[in-house]
């Protein structure tokens, strides 16, 4: 067995000893010296590793137990050291439990991380990351916020002094124009929110919690009191300075006339950029000496979900301050010592959003504020922007082309610094001028106090996180002129929820994740393939390309939905898009219904000028011709200011009759008599309609009338009656159809028809005689004292006398029926062609003498004949008969031969 070389064994021991010892710190900080030393160590380690036996020699050496044991110990130590390095570099996994291939992949991953970190550190050490960021500038055309008014030429006496603006200073018409806005940004800007000490919480479940730790200038101790919803969940928190704002009253000196002092030029004013804690404390001490402070905020909202406050500008009468809030985010709260002091006035312009941004990011609150935007609205100014106020009071044109700048750039370009300074540098002077204007409004003496009250209400605002509801996506549909079906709405809702979740998790805005117009395009087209989704986006957002599969699954689920609703409901119907307009509808001077400056001139009136047919020139006619021209128009049917024409004789008579009718009071009885003929006529018409309806509903034909029966021959009737009576009784009782015996009398034959017969003792009522209307009107024309009652006359008609032949027939019929009337009195046959016999000669029953007390139980309704089925057993002897009976009905037409 070959022995292990002593040199190799000693080198392995030295290498292991050096690995166990901690690395010595380099005395030189030079990058080149450190690199040379590292190369030497790497070369020595490579030589030592290459000195080990390889191939067949290594297999031969491993067969020796001592060599194999030493190599196993060294291998475990090296793997343990590599595992410690991987763990320190946040490489997940245990390298000791992996296979050799997996161990090699883990080492490669660690090398990549180390090389990237080394490259970054070398760039920082070499100063490559300290260079100024490359500024990208783009030009965009946007609508100007103010009117394009050319300044008038000032006189020598007024040059150099601020002039008050007026609506008639220039002859040009104020029109909004397109201005060029410059977009300032930089490439590869580091996201500031990644360097915050406290991570940003974008979740919708957790409400915004104020981060205020101490409460200076307080009347009530600091207490963050939550507000709960109906379900018992925390919805929001109360304002920390709500009690102080409720008790706040502006000092008396703020209601006195101010003495505005023109500020110095920005080039002559000191500027302090506060980006360290030491400078912040120094600025705080200087601000505590100033009675009035102008404040403005610069905000960024494109590459973050809730937004980031990037700059805060403050100005006093002698100095300007710019606070870098990205660096001093967690230390700016010490400025509450000044901002919450009720004795110091804070001046802002349009502070609705500034108040919320200061609360959310910097934990800053304001007490005693004057909002110049509210003051401009109280003064009914034509514009409410800060640029207009500077133009109005200072005749200063402010460049607003940098409103699209990216305020996250560090360091800030000088153009952005000057742009931020001008928002607060002149604001104190504007406050003084506006205060004097408000005090001069004698028509409304409390106007200044109302401005302070409105500004205090703005200070009470609290920040709330943005959230979406189940129908938030429908707001986008209502703003467009498109109509969506249920599939498209399903896709729109899914994409809308995906965008909200992605924006919160990635801390990006909705516009960066997926703009609204792209989202509507995807939901409307519902592309089948992934490339169709990308085709709807131009340019393609990075997060859309990254999560394309998720969006594709949402679209496919929407395509699988059944098409139920073709269009949107009426309450959520879309509105047509308004065409672009150059008019400023928010302007105080825009009065579309003010026509006082217009002259009412009609172009259809006759003219006195005539055109000569030969020369073609207009000529003035002579006076005689002018007199013939009648320029008056047709008289109106009704006029308010002109005297009406004299009415005609017919109109006077009609008006006199109407006045007499309105003045005459008629008695109620006369009114009754006047309406009586009309009511009788209406009742007769109703009876006629009912009679015609009954005739239409009659199923059986009507019986012949009495006159038709009288025309029959008497001898024929008598002979037929004798023949009928000679028939045996059994044949007479057989049922016959009423039309079988046409010659019989319907009055004497009870089974001939179902129509009931009239009572013989009852007489036909005479018809009502309607009095003519002329007679009633003559009676109404008399005086009210002489009431004349018009009686209703009835004409009595005699009943028709029966003929002798009819009397003989009745007598024979009555004599024939007396023989079996008593027998069949209680058992009348029920037939569809026979009537129930009725008794003659009985009059109406007299109920006057009836004692109804004996009928206490009341009457019961008669029940019909109940037919109960007999239930027979299976072994009954009559089952055979029942079967034959059923067979008889089933085969009733089959002749039975041979059976009796």
Curated annotation (Swiss-Prot):
Describe the family membership recorded for this protein in Swiss-Prot or TrEMBL.
Belongs to the exosome component 10/RRP6 family.
Sorted UniProt keywords = Cell cycle, Cell division, Chromosome, Cytoplasm, Cytoskeleton, DNA damage, DNA repair, Exonuclease, Exosome, Hydrolase, Magnesium, Metal-binding, Mitosis, Nuclease, Nucleus, RNA-binding, rRNA processing
Query: For binding Mg(2+) 1, which residues are annotated in this chain's numbering?
Result: 296, 354
What job does this protein perform?
Catalytic component of the RNA exosome complex which has 3'->5' exoribonuclease activity and participates in a multitude of cellular RNA processing and degradation events. Degrades a large variety of non-coding RNAs that are processed by the exosome, such as pre-rRNAs and some small nucleolar RNAs (snoRNAs). Degrades transcripts derived from different types of heterochromatic repeats, such as subtelomeric minisatellites and simple gagaa repeats. Degrades transcripts derived from transposons and transposon fragments.
Spans of biased composition, class Low complexity? Answer: 878-887
**Where in the numbering of this chain does the HRDC domain appear?**
485-565
Give the 3'-5' exonuclease domain ranges: 273-438
Tell me the Pfam families matching this sequence.
DNA_pol_A_exo1, HRDC, PMC2NT
- This one is known as Exosome complex component 10 homolog
Cellular component (GO) terms are:
cell cortex; centrosome; chromosome; midbody; nuclear exosome (RNase complex); nuclear lamina; nucleolus; nucleus
State the SUPFAM superfamilies in the record.
HRDC-like, Ribonuclease H-like
Q: What else is known?
A: rRNA synthesized in the presence of 5-fluorouracil, a pyrimidine analog used in the treatment of solid tumors, is not efficiently degraded by Rrp6.
Keyword DNA repair applies: yes
Q: Which InterPro entries match?
A: 3'-5'_exonuclease_dom (IPR002562), Exosome-assoc_fac_Rrp6_N (IPR012588), HRDC-like_sf (IPR010997), HRDC_dom (IPR002121), HRDC_dom_sf (IPR044876), RNaseH-like_sf (IPR012337), RNaseH_sf (IPR036397), Rrp6-like (IPR045092)
Q: Note the Gene3D superfamilies from the entry.
A: HRDC domain, Ribonuclease H-like superfamily/Ribonuclease H
Provenance organism: Drosophila melanogaster (Fruit fly)
């Amino acid at each position: 067995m070959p022995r292990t070389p002593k040199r190799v064994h000693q080198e392995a021991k030295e290498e292991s000893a050096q690995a166990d010892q901690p690395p010595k710190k380099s005395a030189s900080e030079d990058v080149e010296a450190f690199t040379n030393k590292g190369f030497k160590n790497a070369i020595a380690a490579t030589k030592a590793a290459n000195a080990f036996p390889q191939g067949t020699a290594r297999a031969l050496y491993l067969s020796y137990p001592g060599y194999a044991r030493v190599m196993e110990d060294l291998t475990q130590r090296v793997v343990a050291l590599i595992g410690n390095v991987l763990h320190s570099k946040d490489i997940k996994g245990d390298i000791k439990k992996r296979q050799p291939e997996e161990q090699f992949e883990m080492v490669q991953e660690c090398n990549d991380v180390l090389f990237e970190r080394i490259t970054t550190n070398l760039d920082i050490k070499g100063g490559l990351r300290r260079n100024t960021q490359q500024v990208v500038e783009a030009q965009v055309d946007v609508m100007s916020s103010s009117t394009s008014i050319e300044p008038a030429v000032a006189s020598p006496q007024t040059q150099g002094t601020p002039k008050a603006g007026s609506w008639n200073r220039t002859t040009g018409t104020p029109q909004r124009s397109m201005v060029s806005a410059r977009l300032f940004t930089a490439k590869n800007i580091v996201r500031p929110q990644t360097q915050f000490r406290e991570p940003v919480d974008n979740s919708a479940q957790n409400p915004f919690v104020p981060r205020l730790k101490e409460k200076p200038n307080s009347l009530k101790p600091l207490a963050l009191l939550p507000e709960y919803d109906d379900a018992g969940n925390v919805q929001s928190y109360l304002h920390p300075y709500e009690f102080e704002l409720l008790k706040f009253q502006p000092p008396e000196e703020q209601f006195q006339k101010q003495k505005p002092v023109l500020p110095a030029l920005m080039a002559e004013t000191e500027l302090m950029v506060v980006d360290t804690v030491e400078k912040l404390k120094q600025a705080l001490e200087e601000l505590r000496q100033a009675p009035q402070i102008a404040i403005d905020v610069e905000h960024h909202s494109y590459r973050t979900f809730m937004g980031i406050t990037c700059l805060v500008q403050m100005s006093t009468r002698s100095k300007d301050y710019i606070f870098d809030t990205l660096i001093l985010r967690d230390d700016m709260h010490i400025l509450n010592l000044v901002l919450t002091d009720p004795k110091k006035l804070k001046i802002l312009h349009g502070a609705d959003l500034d108040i919320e941004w200061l609360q959310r990011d910097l934990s800053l609150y304001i007490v005693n504020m004057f909002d110049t935007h509210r003051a401009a609205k109280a003064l009914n100014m034509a514009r409410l922007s800060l640029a207009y106020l500077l133009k109005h009071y200072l005749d200063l044109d402010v460049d607003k082309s940098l409103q699209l700048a990216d305020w996250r750039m560090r360091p800030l370009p000088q153009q952005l610094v000057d742009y931020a300074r001008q928002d607060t540098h002149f604001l104190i002077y504007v406050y003084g001028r506006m205060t004097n204007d408000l005090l001069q409004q004698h028509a409304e003496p409390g106007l200044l106090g109302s401005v302070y009250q409105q500004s205090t209400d703005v200070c009470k605002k609290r920040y709330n996180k943005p959230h979406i509801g189940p129908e938030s996506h429908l707001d986008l549909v209502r703003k467009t002129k498109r109509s969506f079906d249920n599939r498209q709405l399903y896709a729109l809702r899914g994409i809308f929820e995906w965008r909200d979740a992605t924006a919160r998790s990635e801390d990006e805005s909705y516009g960066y994740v997926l703009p609204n117009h792209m989202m509507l395009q995807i939901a409307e087209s519902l592309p089948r393939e992934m490339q169709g989704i990308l085709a709807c986006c131009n340019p393609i957002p990075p997060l859309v390309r990254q999560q394309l599969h998720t969006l594709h699954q949402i679209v496919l689920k929407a395509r699988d939905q059944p098409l139920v609703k073709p269009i949107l409901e009426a309450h959520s119907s879309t509105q047509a898009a308004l065409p672009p307009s150059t008019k400023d509808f928010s302007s105080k001077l825009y009065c579309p219904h003010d026509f006082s400056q217009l002259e009412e001139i009609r172009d259809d009136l006759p003219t006195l000028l005539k055109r000569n047919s030969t020369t073609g020139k207009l000529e003035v006619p002579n006076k005689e011709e002018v007199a013939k021209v009648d320029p008056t128009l047709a008289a109106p049917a009704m006029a308010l200011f002109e005297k009406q024409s004299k009415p005609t004789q017919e109109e006077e008579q009609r008006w006199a009759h109407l006045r007499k009718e309105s003045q005459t009071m008629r008695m109620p009885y006369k009114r009754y008599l006047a309406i009586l003929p009309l009511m009788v006529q209406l009742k007769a018409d109703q009876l006629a309609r009912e009679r015609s309806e009954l005739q239409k509903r009659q199923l059986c034909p009507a019986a012949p009338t009495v006159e038709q029966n009288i025309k029959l021959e008497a001898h024929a009737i008598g002979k037929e009656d004798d023949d009928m009576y000679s028939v045996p009784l059994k044949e007479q009782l057989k049922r016959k159809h009423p039309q079988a015996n046409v010659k019989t009398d319907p009055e004497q034959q009870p089974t001939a028809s179902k129509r009931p017969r009239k009572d013989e003792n009852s007489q036909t009522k005479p018809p009502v005689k309607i009095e003519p209307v002329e007679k009633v009107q003559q009676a109404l024309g008399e005086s009210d004292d002489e009431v004349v009652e018009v009686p209703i006359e009835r004409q009595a008609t005699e009943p028709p006398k029966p003929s002798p032949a009819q009397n003989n027939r009745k007598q024979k019929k009555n004599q024939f029926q007396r023989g079996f009337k008593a027998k069949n009195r209680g058992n009348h046959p029920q037939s569809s062609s026979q009537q129930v016999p009725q008794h003659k000669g009985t009059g109406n029953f007299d109920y006057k003498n009836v004692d109804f007390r004996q009928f206490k139980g009341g009457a019961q309704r008669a029940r019909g004949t109940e037919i109960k089925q007999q239930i027979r057993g299976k072994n009954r002897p009559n089952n055979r008969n029942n079967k034959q009976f059923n067979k008889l009905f089933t085969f009733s037409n089959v002749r039975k031969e041979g059976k009796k």
